[in-house]
Amino acid sequence: MKFTLLGFGLSNKEIFKYLVKNGHEVFVSEGKKLASSDKKLLLENGVQFEENGHTEKALECDIILVSPGVHFENEIIKEAKRRSIEIDTEISFCQREFEKIGWTPFVIAVTGSVGKSTTVSLIYHLLNKKVRALLAGNIGIPIAKLLNDNLRANYLVLEISSFQLFWSKRFKPNISSILNIYPNHLNWHPDMEHYVSSKFKIASFQSKDDVFVYNPNDEYIRKNLYKVSAKKVPFRFDFSIEKLPIHLRYRQTVENVAAAKTILETMGYEFKWEFLEDFEKLPHRMEYVTEINGVKFFNDSKATNAIAVIRAIENFDDKLHLIMAGIGKNEDYTLLAKIIKEKVKILALVGPIADEIEPYLDGVRYFKVDTINQAVNQLFSMASRGDVIMLSPGGASFDAFKNFEERGEYFKQLVMQLKEGNCEEC
C-alpha cells in the first residue's frame, strides 16, 4: 500500500517511521521548507519527498495521512476527494493499527478549548494509582510513537485537538470528554459551527455502550448533546476549590479536576483527594516563577487564546500587570477587554496581537513594545510591592518562538536574570 504524508510534523514523522518499518511505500509532501535533519532522514530511508508546496505527485497513493495543521481547504485535499482517495489522520489510523496487532486498550479521549493537557495528565496520574495507563496525543507524544516503541497498557489516555478530530476518519474512544468550547482557532476554522462540529466528532462513532463525559455548564456543549449516542455523564462539581492541594488551587483547575474525577469514578475507580498531592503541575500553566522585591512573577505561556487569559486573570485581584504577546486567532476580545479594564493595572502588548486587541482597549492603561524582554523590564519598573506580573499571551508563539514552551522558558530566564540584578532581599 502506498501512503502520502501531507505535512511532516511531529505526528507524521512517527507514522513515517512506522510505515517504513512495515515495508510500505511512502511519499512525503511538505508545504514548508523541510529541516536538513528531516531531509537526511528521508534520504537515508530512500523516501521521495517534496517541499515548499504540494504537487499532484502527492495524489499518487492509496491513502493520504494529513498532519493536523494542514488546512481543510488545501487544494491537494480537494483533488484527493474528487478522486476518491482515502484521507485520514494519526488518531484513527493508529487505532486501526492497534486492532491489527491485537492491542485494544480502553481509550479515554479528551478535547476542549482550554485545559486539555492538564486534564489528561490528571487522568493519567490518577489511573496509574490503580492500574497501568499510557498518555499520548496532542500533549506532545505522538500516538504512533506507542507503535514504534512497542508500548502497551490496558488503558490509553489521549489529548485530542479540533484539527485531529476534523481529519479523523473513524475514531471511537470508550470514554470521550469535552471540557469546554470557546471561540478558538478561528483563523483555521471558518466559524464557530465548524469548530464545534469538529470538537463533537470525538463522540461521533461512539455507541450506547460508550460514555461521553461533559461540562454541564458549557452552553455550546449543552446545545449539541443531541448529537451524542453514548451514555452522557456530566462533570460532578461536588467540591470546593479549598479541597485542592495548594499547588493546584487555581480557578481553572477546578474544571480539570472535576473532569478527571468524574471519569475515574465513571470507570469504577475510587477517587481520593490525597491522590492529587504528588501530581506535578505542568509547566507554563499558571506557573509561579519567583518574587523580586515583593513583586511576584507568573508564567502562563500556554494561554494562547482569550478565554485562557480571562481564566488566568480571575485568579488575581487588581494588582496584576499583564503581558500579552504573539499571534491572535481572529477572536472577539470584548469580554477579555472588560476583565482587563476591571482587574489589570497595566497591560503590555508585544507582537502582532497588539493590532488585533487594541481597538477593544478603550479605558485600559497599556503600552506596546517589540519584545517580551522590554515588557518585563518596563512593567517591573512600574510595579509596587504586592503586585503581580504575569505572562499570559493570548496568542500563538510562532511570531518569535518555536512553541509556547520556548516562549515560557525565555520569560522565566528573563525574570531570573532580572532577579540577579535587582533582588534586595535575597
UniProtKB/Swiss-Prot annotation:
It is found in: Cytoplasm. ATP binds at residues 112-118. It catalyses: UDP-N-acetyl-alpha-D-muramoyl-L-alanine + D-glutamate + ATP = UDP-N-acetyl-alpha-D-muramoyl-L-alanyl-D-glutamate + ADP + phosphate + H(+). Its main location: cytoplasm. One of its GO terms (cellular component) is cytoplasm. Its EC number is 6.3.2.9. This is UDP-N-acetylmuramoylalanine--D-glutamate ligase. Gene3D superfamilies: Mur ligase, C-terminal domain (3.90.190.20), Mur-like, catalytic domain (3.40.1190.10), NAD(P)-binding Rossmann-like Domain (3.40.50.720). Cell wall formation. Catalyzes the addition of glutamate to the nucleotide precursor UDP-N-acetylmuramoyl-L-alanine (UMA). Keywords: ATP-binding, Cell cycle, Cell division, Cell shape, Cell wall biogenesis/degradation, Cytoplasm, Ligase, Nucleotide-binding, Peptidoglycan synthesis. Pathway: Cell wall biogenesis; peptidoglycan biosynthesis. HAMAP family: MurD. It comes from the Bacteria. It holds the Pfam family Mur_ligase_M. Belongs to the MurCDEF family. The gene is murD. One of its GO terms (molecular function) is UDP-N-acetylmuramoylalanine-D-glutamate ligase activity.
